[in-house]
Amino acid sequence: ERGEEYIVGQKAHTYQYEGGGAAALGSIHPQPLTFESDGTLDLEKVAAVIKPDDFHFPPTRLLCLENTHRGQALSLDYLYAVQQFVSEKNLKLHLDGARIFNASVELNIHAKKIAKHFDSVSFCLSKGLGAPVGSILCGSKNLITHARRWRKTLGGGMRQAGIIAAAGLYALQNNIERLSEDHKNAQLLAKGLNEIEQLTIDPKSVQTNMVFVDAHKIDCQELTSFLKSNGVLIQGSGLLRLVTHLDIREKDITTAVKAFKAYFN
């Protein structure tokens, strides 16, 4: 509710890349924390920022996690620990599961074994699943009834949306298992780029479909132009995020790695 607080990762998408929507539209106060290297939030640090029952502070009500975060899947052991933690602290638990199916494929489990730990879960039908558009919010009947009202209030109602739903259903029925192909291609990309001395990359950190490349020591604008002239499109500077997906094949990985190597040679 208005004036209450949620705890969230400093680099979480819901905190950093949604135009301040939680504050602007929800009037709720974020308490950001730094992610650990494995994409988790340290529960001791979370406990330390939960506000006391004092009118000087916003009441802490919610903990938000992201899975995957930077391509890393949260372990089930961690999720069990978090579930016990929020129960003890009387907090609700939300998952930004935009790529929850990448996490489930990496962990070799059904997505419901991840989702069951949370009070609410959102996930994308696009991104890895390949639908043209759409996201889903999951939760209790009461939560979804409340969310639908807010969606309408904010102008989110749609007409003749069945064609979008059809694409989403196809993605859920056909495109989950194939996510392992994206993960394999990301590993190939990481291995190839790791052979380039001027780039810094940790192949062991590549669990799903994201490869992060430290390119702070090079001219990224020049690199981007060169790669574009060789049929490879990237964006960003300093830290490059390369994402494999439905439209990327192994031959495309080979093309990309060759283009990167040609630039540095």
PLM-predicted stretches and their roles:
Residues 1-203, 207-217, 221-248, 256-264:
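Conserved PLP-enzyme active-site core in the AAT-like
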